[in-house]
Each structure stands twice: as structure tokens, then as C-alpha cells.
């Protein structure tokens, strides 16, 4: 079998869009229609400590159809792009082997791009280098660590903002643990794109609709136990630079629990921060193709609100996906 023919028989569906656009609900509708396995492509939904604040699928949804890579990491770890790619490829291949259709669902563009465009294969720096990077960020701050990095690896440092603690720490641990910087590894080692037939549905609701939905959802999260979720995180004494500690709502609710903000102030700040993030997500997805033009559908509304409109959107998305899968199997 040729590579092109093999790819036609290996469909991967992609459901992407900004936070709170209704991706999970659409993924469930599609999974019912295509006997699908939903594979998480959200960098915060990988953390088991953050079911509420990351709006992970409900236990009922997880029982109805297979969900993979949700809640699989403790908050003490980092779900890097390379880690996710390796796990996602394994889950996609397992779905194919079981006769199911894999459905990537999420809003983390760099995760999705690791499959569509490939990824630099950087060696594991090791636990000592990771611990050193976290210690330096916590003790000195990201700007000071950025200065250290610039002295030994100026090329990698030049590509990073000094305040980006996560990426600065990652660059330091790579240099410290491998003896080469990020820029070096990006030039020398690459994992190829996944050989498959991609069909993508991107949700792109109006920003005012999204802002209103974010506010409603965050209020529901607070009522549903988000404060207890953050309280449990704080009890672990985790470094603030860890990704889980920077998830939407965590810093703001943590400030409230410390007495630095009222609950209304924390809620307002969290909603604003999430809204700013969704703008960046929408911009990113508008400039990065997840599938070919004929295999891509953009839906300009949120999957929520009016029930009849939502059902029409579900039907349109499922019809498009089934048609493109069928076309892909007939033609190269």
C-alpha cells in the first residue's frame, strides 16, 4: 500500500477553536456519528487536579464514548508538546487498530501543530535539569534566568520574552541537560507530520458571544467547586511557574483565597484573562491550517445557547465530516 493510500484509510478528525466555544459538545456529537475516540488536545485538560476549572468532559460523557489524555498528569508535572505528541500518536493508532475514528479536540495550537507540521525531537534534559530550572525561576524570577540563558545560549534567549517563565525555564533546562540550546535542536532533529487524512472543524464564534459565555461558565465553575479545587492545589505547595498553577482562574482564585482579592475581583480578572487568551487562540487558528481547504469547515457560532441552532450546527458538522471521509477514501 502506498503512503497516500495508507493515509486515506487513516482519518483523523480535528475539532478546534477558542476556549468556551463548545468543542467538547461538538466532539461528543461527532463521536456518536462516527464511532469515535476523543483525544484531548488541550494543554490544561491533561491535569487530573483541574477537572472543574478546565471544563473537562463530565464522567457521563467519558462513560458514553472513549476519551483519552484527559486528567492523566499530576499538577507537579509539565505536559510538554513533545510528551503530548508521543501520547497522542499512540492513542490515535490504538483507535485505528480498534476500528474507531480518532477525534482530536482542543484549543492548544502547538499541540495540534505537532501532528500537522511535525515537531523537533529534543532529547529529555533529565529531572536534575528540570529541577534546577524551576528552582532558579522561583528564586530569581524569569527575567534573571533569561539573563543567565542569554550569557550561555544567546540565540535561544533572543527568541524568548524575559517574562515568559515557562518557556525560559524550558530553554534553560534543555541547555543545562543536553549541552545544546533549543535553537540547535530545532535545526537538527525533527519528527515528521502524522501520516493521515485530516478533516477539521474550527469553531469561530463572535467575540462578544464568547465573552458572555466565559463569564457565565466561570460563575458556574465557582459555584461548582472551583475554590475547593484551587485550595487543594495550594495545599500541595507547588511552584507558581508550573503550568497547572497558571491555568485560567487558578492565579485569581488563589489570590482570593490568600485574602488579596475579593471573589468578585478574582472572577472579573479571571474572565478578562480568559477573554484575552481566546483572542490569541482565534488569531492563531485563523493563520494555521489544520487540514486542506476542501477538508476544513469553519462554524462562526458557539456550540451553545439556542437548542435548534445548535442541533443544526451539529448536523452540518457531522454531514461535512462524513462526506469528506468518504471522498478521501475514493480519491488520493
From Swiss-Prot:
InterPro entries with a match to the protein in the record: Dimethylallyltransferase, IPT, P-loop_NTPase
Keywords noted in UniProt: ATP-binding, Magnesium, Nucleotide-binding, Transferase, tRNA processing
Binding of substrate, residues: 19-24
General function of this protein: Catalyzes the transfer of a dimethylallyl group onto the adenine at position 37 in tRNAs that read codons beginning with uridine, leading to the formation of N6-(dimethylallyl)adenosine (i(6)A).
Binding site for ATP: 17-24
GO biological processes: tRNA modification
Renumbered residue ranges of the record's region Interaction with substrate tRNA: 42-45, 166-170
Catalytic activity: adenosine(37) in tRNA + dimethylallyl diphosphate = N(6)-dimethylallyladenosine(37) in tRNA + diphosphate
Pfam annotation, one family: IPPT
Broad class of enzyme this protein falls into: transferase
UniProt keyword Nucleotide-binding present: yes
A GO molecular function held by the record: tRNA dimethylallyltransferase activity
Family designation: Belongs to the IPP transferase family.
Designated name of the protein: tRNA dimethylallyltransferase
Annotated organism of origin: Gluconacetobacter diazotrophicus (strain ATCC 49037 / DSM 5601 / CCUG 37298 / CIP 103539 / LMG 7603 / PAl5)
Oligomer status and interactors: Monomer.
NCBIfam families given in the database record: miaA
Documented EC number(s): 2.5.1.75
Marked site (Interaction with substrate tRNA) residue numbers: 108, 130
Cofactor: Mg(2+)
Amino acid at each position: 500500500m502506498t503512503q497516500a493510500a495508507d493515509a486515506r484509510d487513516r482519518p483523523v478528525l480535528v475539532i478546534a477553536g477558542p476556549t468556551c466555544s463548545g468543542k467538547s459538545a461538538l466532539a461528543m456529537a461527532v463521536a456518536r456519528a462516527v464511532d469515535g475516540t476523543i483525544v484531548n488536545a488541550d494543554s490544561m485538560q491533561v491535569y487530573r487536579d483541574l477537572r472543574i476549572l478546565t471544563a473537562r468532559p463530565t464522567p457521563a460523557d467519558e462513560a458514553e464514548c472513549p476519551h483519552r489524555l484527559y486528567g492523566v498528569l499530576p499538577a507537579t508535572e509539565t505536559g510538554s508538546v513533545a510528551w503530548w505528541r508521543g501520547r497522542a500518536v499512540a492513542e490515535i493508532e490504538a483507535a485505528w487498530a480498534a476500528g474507531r475514528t480518532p477525534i482530536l479536540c482542543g484549543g492548544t495550537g502547538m499541540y495540534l501543530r505537532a501532528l500537522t507540521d511535525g515537531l523537533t525531537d529534543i532529547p529529555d534534559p533529565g529531572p536534575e535539569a528540570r529541577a534546577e530550572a524551576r528552582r532558579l525561576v522561583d528564586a530569581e524570577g524569569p527575567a534573571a534566568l533569561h539573563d543567565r540563558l542569554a550569557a550561555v545560549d544567546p540565540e535561544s534567549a533572543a527568541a524568548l520574552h524575559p517574562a515568559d517563565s515557562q518557556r525560559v525555564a524550558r530553554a534553560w533546562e534543555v541547555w543545562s541537560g543536553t549541552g545544546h540550546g533549543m535553537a540547535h535542536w530545532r535545526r537538527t532533529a525533527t519528527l515528521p507530520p502524522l501520516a493521515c487524512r485530516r478533516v477539521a472543524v474550527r469553531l469561530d464564534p463572535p467575540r462578544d458571544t464568547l465573552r458572555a459565555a466565559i463569564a457565565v461558565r466561570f460563575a458556574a465553575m465557582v459555584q461548582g467547586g472551583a475554590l475547593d479545587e484551587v485550595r487543594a492545589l495550594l495545599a500541595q505547595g507547588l511552584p507558581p511557574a508550573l503550568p497547572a498553577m497558571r491555568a485560567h482562574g487558578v492565579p485569581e482564585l488563589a489570590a482570593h483565597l490568600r485574602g488579596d482579592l475579593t471573589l468578585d475581583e478574582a472572577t472579573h480578572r479571571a474572565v478578562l484573562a480568559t477573554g484575552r487568551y481566546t483572542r490569541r487562540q482565534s488569531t492563531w487558528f485563523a493563520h494555521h491550517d489544520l487540514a486542506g481547504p476542501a477538508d476544513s469547515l469553519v462554524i462562526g457560532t458557539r456550540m451553545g445557547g439556542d437548542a435548534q441552532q445548535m442541533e443544526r450546527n451539529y448536523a452540518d458538522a457531522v454531514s461535512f465530516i462524513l462526506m469528506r471521509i468518504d471522498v478521501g477514501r475514493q480519491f488520493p
